[in-house]
Structure formats: structure tokens, C-alpha cells
């Protein structure tokens, strides 16, 4: 997953900052709308960028990547209850609840940082491949997998011993991954326009499938019951794939800069968040038939999200942005810069 910072290409206008837990007017019944905002303050060092959000249903906490730290936020109140700080460049957070351990992919340090889920204190550092990005826990193998965007491989970690037990060549730049809970992991290979299936018990690649007509695969999630993958392409397409055959069943147009897809089993809804400021909501009518429910206008930059299955609320983070600079010879395609101190969580629900 690409971090959101000054290196992202887009056109933005300055949005006025959101205050803590601002209640907003109700939308029509049944439609997703903005319920509140949680102000999360400035990033350490003043440079705003962010990546994955992880929701822990047992503690009802959100783990939010923010520059060189992970902020831990109460999902119901927006209160910041702690942080894991002094990191280099945070990407993702994987939780191994039965061990009460969390694992942070620190891309700037080429390592995974281990912390205690209760005390939030760091307990270890694990060297990985270059720029660990996505990080997930696979319950079938009981291992943690990092997808390393610089070295094009995956580091396999035993969370009981905090050690790397295998390294898997991915054959391209790995992005978002999802585990099916039965021993298969599906990972987007962004620069190859592919999805690979990986046997998590043998640490071997089993299949490589094209995501065409989608390109630059980033976000992915899965309907495990019906074996469907939801793949976000940076060419503004959502591709729905059969996880057993690699067949692309259906596609939908989406906004630019997708970075999160979420499937909710209880409602059969698919949520797709994009950088341009759209939350697309689709429905699985049948395993081979999907439909558009609605497209919710969010805010520019709001492309990293998490879902609370209990309340059906979606949490998306973003910030305000300055104006786009004038093009120069050195920077022919300049990008707007996030404004320090405006980072926030947007909470959407019905």
C-alpha cells in the first residue's frame, strides 16, 4: 500500500479542519453518511503521512499508522489511549490476539516492531526484507507475513518466537494481501497486474492470475464463504475474481487512488475507499452477481479504511491539503502537501 503524503499525485483544495467528534446532520435513512470526526493531531516531526488502519473488535480499538508512530484510538469515542512511537515509517499493523502481541511493518527500518497489546510497550524488533508494507496474520499456519515492496519478497514470521522462518520470492512488487483462514494467502503484485495465491503452510506460490482489465492491483479483501476476491486497481476499476480459478467475474468503475477494499460478511457489502474522496458501496447479490448500492462523497485523501462489524461503521483517515504548487522543470507534476496537525478519522455509518 502506498503511503499518503506529499508524493501522491492529485489536485486538491484546502479543506477546513475537522474538530473532535463533530456531529453532522443526518442523511436519508439507509444511506451511509458522515457521523463524526476524530481529531488525531499532528504527526511526529510535523510531516503528515499515513497508511493502514487495523480494527480490534475485542478491545474496540483502532490502530492507526501515522508517520513514525501508531496511534491507538477508542473506536467509540475517538480518544487516543496510547501510541507506539519512535518508528521510522509505519505501514501496517497485524494483531495476534491469543499471544497478546501486535506486529508493525516499519518500512523505513526494514523491520517489524513487536509490541504488547495491553501495555503498548515494544518488546522486539525483527529484520525483514526491504520496505515491509502490508502485514497480516494467517491463522492456518499461525504465522505473520510481511509483503516487502523493495525486495519483492515476503518475510514469514513465527509470532511465538519473533523470528523469520522463511522468505518467499513474490516475482514482483507485493501489495495488499488477504488470508482465507484455510491455508491460502492472496496477494496483489502491483507492477505485474497480477494476483498470486500462496500456500501458507508450504510457503510456495501456487498460481498467478491476471487482473485484467484492472491494472496496478492495490487493495484486496475476500468473501471467504463464496471464495470471491475484491481487487482494487489503480486504473479506477474494482475487479471481482474467483479465488479458486482466477477468473474475473465482474468489474466496476471506481474513483482514483483506491487503497482499501472491505467485505462485510453479515451484510454482503463491499466498501471501496479512494484517494479522490469516494466511498463506493457494492452488494453481493449472488456469488456471480454484484450491484452498486451507493457512492458516498468523503474527503480528498480518504483512502485508508477499517470496518467495525458490530456497528457497521467505516473509519477512514485523511487530512487537509495545501494548494498544488506550480509545475517546474524539476517537478513537472507537483503534488499538494498534507497540512500538519489536521490528521483525522472520518466515521461513516447509517
Language-model features: locations:
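Alpha-helix initiation/capping motif
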Residues: 2, 20, 240-242
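Bacterial N-terminal signal peptides
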Residues: 11-23
